[in-house]
Each structure stands twice: as C-alpha cells, then as structure tokens.
Amino acid sequence: MEAVWKEVETEHYTFHYKSGTVAEKELQQVIELQENCYKEITDKLKFIPEKKLIYWLCDTRVEVMQISGFEYETNGVTFLDRENPTIYAVYNEEVKCVGFHEDVHAISCECAWSGSIALFEGLAMYFDKEWWKIPNELCTRVYIEDEKYEKPVLMILADEYFYGIEDKISYPIMGAFTAFLLDNYGIDKYKGLCRSYDDEWEQTFQSIYEKSLQTLEDEFVHMILSQTYSPQQLENARKKLYAR
C-alpha cells in the first residue's frame, strides 16, 4: 500500500511527511529542532517572515527531485518564493537534512538576499557553525596551513569561481568569513551589504565597511591564525576533511 502524505502546522512551519516513515516517527523532534533554529535565525537577522516555511520531508534524494521538480538529485533544496518559501529535504535513518541551512536560505531571501552565491552559502554556514562536525574556523585553519585555502575575495567576486571549488573547502571558509563579519561589524552592516549590492562588490564593501574587501580578508586570516588549536585537534580535523 502506497504511503499517504500527511500535513501538520506549527507556529512557523507547515510540515508534509508520509505515513510509516522515519519522518513521521521522529516528527516531534523535527518540529522542536526547526522551531529552535527559526528563533535563532530570526533573532540574529532581526526579521520575521510573513509566511510560514513549508517543509516536504522525503525518503530519498530521488524523491526530493521528483516532488520538487529540481534538476538533479539532492539531499535538500529551497525554493525562494516569498509567498510560499518551500524546502524539500531527505529525512531517513541515515540522512536527516534538517537544521539551520535551508531555513536560513528561505528566511534570509526576504531581508538579507545576496547576489553572491558565496555570501548566500556563507550565511547558512554561519548558522551551521561546522562542516562534518568540524568548526568552520578550524577547517579554515587547516586549509591555510596546508595551502588549500581559497580566498573569500575571489569567491565573492565570481560565482563561477565559487562553484569550481570543492564544497568541503568553500562552504566552511565562507561560513567562518561570515562569522568574522557579523561578530566584528554587526548584522546591520551585513544586511546593508546585501541590500546595497550593485554588481560591484569591492565598491560595496568599501562603502559599507569603510575598508576594502582585501583588507577585511587580511583581518580574517589574521584572526584565524591567532586562534589556538592543539596538534591533536588539527590532526583530527585533517583526517576527517581529507578522508572523503
């Protein structure tokens, strides 16, 4: 018998899930997790969307593609429609594509939409805080030491450059760089940066932060190198990052 799609509404979400699935079994956990993420995201961005976020909890990557109409198989995808912000995510025993990332995309598209994919993903990674359970800043430190570091300047200026880099490198670096901007210069400047985008990122950064993009990156690298990690922490991070 084919599973039946069900629906439940919470304060800020509408969840779709199928009967007899892991998603149904763990639905209350998912609801609590996402509502907590929603509060943290909206508190930081100082913004609450008018519409609820719509979630489709799917069994497989293939099902995500089929139901969403997305062009290829994926664990999660967000359709940035302000009237119907919709997230399709895999949720099964092995993969649970929930948490901050896709919700950040759905919420920020209304108040901190960036024309740069690097900044777009960087904001989501700022909330994720880690890649494969390794803090973004520690990932970045490893890449700097191992000469695998990719410059945020280049990733921000050209989407094609960002897309050409392995996710395990580009995503945590941009997450750490976004944390640097937010922690040191505040959310208002960051939102101003996104709203002021005019195809000239270097000029926009200079106008908003009164510093060049390169100067900000230099400060960021100095901050990363000034953090203290034990040899064991660095070695453990390397093993995880380079094992895949």
Annotate each language-model stretch with its function.
Residues 2-116, 201:
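Juxtacatalytic substrate-recognition/specificity segment
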Residues 69-83, 90-94, 110-244:
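Acidic/His/Gly-enriched intrinsically disordered linker/tail segments
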